[in-house]
């Protein structure tokens, strides 16, 4: 009489592994779409059911017959045996750029080559250039000048010079009082009568062509916003508010155009535009009072 063999636990078909996931289910719907039901574990280790609805769209593209034939060739050389299509480690797929030369592109190319030979490259031209402030002539950008709110640019009327220095000396001396030595506020000193006009004149930021964009993604970049709005006209300034600690966007930005008509067209087209899974709200910026 033969001895009965001991059953192996791996042969038990009814064994249920609590960590195993149910198989993926694919259902074809009447409208041609497919419903894919799959399971996965989330970060907390819980089993999560994921339902996706997939619609297949066939896009017909007319290509050159010779190009279509070359795509059917088997790969050779170092790529022999690899799957069809471009390989990401050897091929870089870029954007298809449509080149439209101008009518007189030959003359422009010849002129650019001639000017480049005479003046040298742009790098050589800017090699000895230094940043110079238009307000105080210091070696910093004009926007970062500490005197931009109190001084006019050097090439504007009222800027500091030989005569301006003398006048400044008189104002500085008179700033402490007409003669009694008492303190006089800056807006009551000599030459400050037109302060209000100066603030409301050419030195005030022109908000007539500035758009306020809200509901901006915190992952947005200034260059991306510039590319989005430059389709409607020349953009002079892009300001994206960021958090000081995280350097992420706060959710709003200001876009300034050179022409108000371009700003109006951009406001009409971009209001309600989807950007980074959010709907942008675009309106004209209100003038600060």
From Swiss-Prot:
InterPro entries in UniProt: eIF3_g, eIF3g_N, eIF3G_RRM, Nucleotide-bd_a/b_plait_sf, RBD_domain_sf, RRM_dom
GO terms for biological process, alphabetical: formation of cytoplasmic translation initiation complex; translation reinitiation; translational termination
Main location: cytoplasm
Pfam family, one: eIF3g
Cellular component per GO, a single term: eukaryotic translation initiation factor 3 complex, eIF3e
GO molecular function: RNA binding; translation initiation factor activity
Cellular compartments annotated: Cytoplasm
Superkingdom field: Eukaryota
CDD domains: eIF3G (cd12933), RRM_eIF3G_like (cd12408)
Residue ranges annotated for the RRM domain, each copy included: 209-287
Region (Disordered): 1-33
Keyword Transferase: no
Keyword entries, A-Z: Cytoplasm, Initiation factor, Protein biosynthesis, RNA-binding
Family listed: Belongs to the eIF-3 subunit G family.
Subunit structure: Component of the eukaryotic translation initiation factor 3 (eIF-3) complex.
General function of this protein: RNA-binding component of the eukaryotic translation initiation factor 3 (eIF-3) complex, which is involved in protein synthesis of a specialized repertoire of mRNAs and, together with other initiation factors, stimulates binding of mRNA and methionyl-tRNAi to the 40S ribosome. The eIF-3 complex specifically targets and initiates translation of a subset of mRNAs involved in cell proliferation. This subunit can bind 18S rRNA.
HAMAP family assigned: eIF3g (MF_03006)
Record protein name field: Eukaryotic translation initiation factor 3 subunit G
Source organism: Emericella nidulans (strain FGSC A4 / ATCC 38163 / CBS 112.46 / NRRL 194 / M139)
Gene assigned in the entry: tif35
């Amino acid at each position: 009489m033969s001895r009965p063999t001991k059953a192996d636990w791996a042969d038990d078909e009814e064994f249920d592994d609590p960590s195993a996931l149910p198989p993926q289910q694919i259902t074809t719907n009447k409208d041609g779409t497919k419903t894919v039901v799959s399971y996965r574990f989330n970060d907390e280790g819980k089993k999560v059911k994921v339902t996706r609805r997939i619609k297949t769209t066939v896009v017909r593209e007319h290509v050159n017959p010779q190009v279509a034939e070359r795509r059917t060739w088997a790969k050779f050389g170092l790529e022999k045996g690899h799957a069809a299509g471009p390989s990401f480690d050897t091929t870089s797929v870029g954007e298809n750029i449509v080149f439209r030369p101008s009518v007189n592109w030959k003359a422009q190319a010849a002129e650019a080559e001639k000017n480049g030979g005479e003046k040298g490259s742009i790098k050589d031209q800017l090699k000895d250039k230094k940043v110079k402030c238009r307000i105080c002539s210091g070696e910093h950008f004009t926007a970062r000048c500490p005197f931009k709110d109190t001084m006019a640019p050097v090439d504007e009327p009222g800027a500091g010079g030989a005569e301006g220095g003398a006048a400044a000396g008189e104002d500085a001396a008179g700033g402490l009082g007409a003669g009694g030595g008492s303190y006089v506020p800056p807006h009551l000193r000599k030459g400050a009568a037109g302060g209000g006009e100066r603030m409301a004149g050419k030195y005030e930021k022109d908000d007539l062509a500035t758009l306020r964009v809200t509901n901006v993604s915190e992952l947005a970049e200034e260059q991306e916003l510039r590319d989005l709005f430059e389709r409607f006209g020349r953009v002079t300034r892009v300001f994206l508010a960021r958090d000081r600690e995280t350097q992420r966007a706060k959710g709003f930005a200001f876009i300034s155009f050179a022409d108000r008509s371009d700003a109006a067209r951009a406001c009409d087209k971009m209001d309600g535009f989807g950007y980074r899974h959010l709907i942008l709200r675009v309106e004209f910026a209100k003038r600060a009072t």
